[in-house]
Amino acid sequence: EQIAGWQRASVKLPDWAACDSLIFPPQVPMEQCSSQFTAQYKARLAQHLLENQLADADASDSTSLVDLTGGFGVARVFDHATYVERQSNLCDIARHNFPLLVLAHAEVINDDSTVVLRQLAPVSMIFLDPARRDDHGSRTYAIADCTPDVLALQDLLLVKAPLVMVKLSPMLDWHKTVNDFAGAVHEVHIISTGNECKELLLVLERERCAAPRVVCVNDEQILEYEANHGSTEDADGIAHASSDGEEPLAGTRTGAIGADRWQYLYEPNASIMKAGCFAVISQRFDVHPIGPNSHLFVSAKPVDGFPGRSFAIESIATMNKRELKQALAGLTHANIAVRNFPLSVTQLRNKLKLKDGGHTYLFATTDAQGRHLVLRT
């Protein structure tokens, strides 16, 4: 188990793997724990939230954290930290590991988190990473099915701390989750690494909030906006249409830019996709959606800082055989992606008779007029 734990840590938590004499937790806690990148992100966020809190003249200069679910990615930024874990073996591991991880200021309590919460004196922040497995070890995603049930404890949590940070499954619908907390959510952080969505992080506060701040993070790419600014829209200026056949591309328009001016293509990163803030990025970066559900954008000029991948468009074709032959001339290998397209990647690859790989990327999608397009980049 220790060898397997070290192997998992070497990928997920290299600082742990480099620490001699560390005891690694069992597989399930290691699977749910934050990666080093996301743990460091949460620590920076906690520091920022604390600084804002300490700016209040009535706030104490001493800061304290209670982690009700045994995590401690944010413990270093607090003067005192309390780790609550109901499994005694994990508490023993924590007591051994904390001094090695420069967390000697952390107190370990072996008890049920809800019991501790009711007896808790006021603290600066409470952190929770609810267990996402049921009594049979199966994965759960709904908040009410996780342990502890943060929704049921929401009022008590905010009595005990002015700031509550909750880590949740990235599988959750964040819009519904924010609504479930009935105005307590002030910030939503959607965290991805390597373009894979890893965590949904909520910051709860006592005052009601109508428009939470949404932060989309993918490694070094960060985009922020307020949730009421187009967060649930696909994009502005798109109308659904259909076509009875694969007509030539000439004359096609989408949004505010004609297809003959499509020079650059943009693919949003995983956090943007999870947020669904397509109208936000369309307006902020002056890029135009290819179609209502394509989630791909184009521009006539290059755009700096787009939160995702950018490509120069070499050619565009409908599924018209003559156009395809001309657009794909000389191509034997390609990386293919499909968005709102009737064929799968495998089906399209077979139809185009292309092998996987190479330096060329093909994006197959459907435009605002319902035409099926293949963009070579």
Predicted regions and their residues:
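SAM-dependent transferase fold signal centered on methyltransferase-like domains
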Residues: 1-377
